[in-house]
Amino acid sequence: MTNVIEEKNENYPIKIKECLSDYKPIYYRGNLSLLDKPSIAIVGSRKASSYGKSCARALAKCAVEYGAVVVSGLALGIDSEAHSACLENGGVDVFYPKRNQAMQKRIEETGLLLSEYEDGTRAQRYTFPVRNRIISAISDAIVIVEAGSRSGSLITAECAQEQGKEVYSIPGNITSPGSLGTNKLIRDGAVPLINFDELFEDLGLSKSNKKIDQIFLSKTESRVLEVVKGGSELSIEQIRHIIDIDLAEINAIITILEMKGLIFCEMGKVSIANLWK
């Protein structure tokens, strides 16, 4: 179910209010309080290179380790890599707008979906710059991972600069058309991001030291987690057979453990989240 929060509501996201003069009602699913947590936007080209994808995934994983929320737009390429890596490593993320249904469902359960548009609104050329200004507004820092000279992510960087946000850019091969935008950002004053730890230290964050034993688990949840830790990739049916509980209960427990960032479930296969390996 999609919720809406009006402009005059006292709980309207403060980050959007502070950055935008023309803010509108926000439609959302998931945990709106994530907007109060430290966050970084990870954006870039849809036609990402293997280098760009690798950087996006590594940065998202690092964000999880520092306890930061990952924000992106769920476009192909860099955005999708960032969301996927964040979920795989037990993190939480926010994306705007709602597009990929499978990813949308997973983020809805553990993170936040956010849009200025009602369900059913078709994406138009003008909606993407609108999206980009929201992405930068709800983020504490913006990282452009890989971008050509006409990449839409450069609009996000421009919005961030107008909003007084720090823009980071990952340097790329100077002979690659896909890195022209990111390299130009650095030339024009963006912070060259060559050490991911420095970004999070700039935000005043330190690496998460939470342990599994510090997270409350019921007796059955603990049993399921132990089974998952003992295997590589197990099907839900295999786990149910080992523990001998009914399918409805095991499905509920899998969902709870995934929401707690302890496991990763995709295509019916369950594995321990990378952060806990």
What are these regions (language model features)?
Residues 2-277:
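Glycine-biased, small-residue-rich flexible motifs in mid-sequence functional cores and linkers
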